[in-house]
């Protein structure tokens, strides 16, 4: 089989799989708790299921934590792990109480290792305390137009 025919056959098979997947969404089959599929050019909703349900954000919360840290902090600034950040449950970068890393290192721990301890240390560094940082998170979400978003902590763990 020539290279052109092989390429065309591969494209045809890919289109079949893509068409079947889109067809399943159009029929409303999903195992997700919520979903929304929109047409990019028009913004028309092609499929939605529980689209306005309030659901836990889990670790996607850390994206807002990182955004605020980058916008409001200095990457070379030292960030010290408090007793509050030490031993936070869930995924961790295993900070020791009193350990100091740069904000940049904490951000790597937050986003690459999903470090809940790093999230709390960053929140305390940027906001002064976790509750004050959460206020910043919710204010920034409102500025971005995320009017149906509510943060309760910097790491997304259930309260």
Task: Go through each PLM region and give its residues.
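Active-site-adjacent loops and short helices of periplasmic peptidoglycan-processing enzymes
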Residues: 22-159
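Bacterial N-terminal signal peptides that target proteins for export
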Residues: 1-11
